[in-house]
Curated annotation (Swiss-Prot):
Phosphoserine: residues bearing it: 22, 25, 28
Protein name: Matrix Gla protein
SMART domains xref list: GLA
Keyword flag Ribosomal protein: no
Organism: Gallus gallus
Upper lineage: Eukaryota, Metazoa, Chordata, Craniata, Vertebrata
Residues covered by the Gla domain: 52-98
Length: 103
């Protein structure tokens, strides 16, 4: 019986020594919060700020579809945007800006 108690005590000591979690593993900030916040999410990606990127952006702005231009115009006008929430952007653009082109 005495040998059994000694073996159980020895097993508990071995288990405590091997299963102990050190503080070094908790020092990392990723341990508590592994996700990046929105401000740091794209911080490690380089922006393409060269002349080619600027030209491509200007080409994209110049070649917008008419529906996209109408939607942007409608988004800038508060009443049109509110109307668009209920009836859609094409109907809102026609309601507020469609008659102006015919004059």
């Amino acid at each position: 019986m005495r040998a059994l108690i000694v073996l159980v005590l020895l097993a508990v000591l071995v288990m405590a020594a091997t299963c102990y979690e050190s503080h070094e593993s908790m020092e990392s900030h990723e341990y508590l919060n592994p996700f990046l916040n929105r401000q740091r999410a794209n911080g490690f990606i380089r922006d393409d700020t060269g002349l080619r990127a600027v030209l491509q952006e200007r080409i994209r702005e110049r070649n917008k579809a008419p529906q996209e231009r109408q939607r942007e115009i409608c988004e800038d006008f508060h009443l049109c945007e509110q109307y668009a929430l209920n009836h859609g952007y094409p109907a809102a653009y026609r309601h507020y800006f469609g008659r102006r082109r015919n004059k």
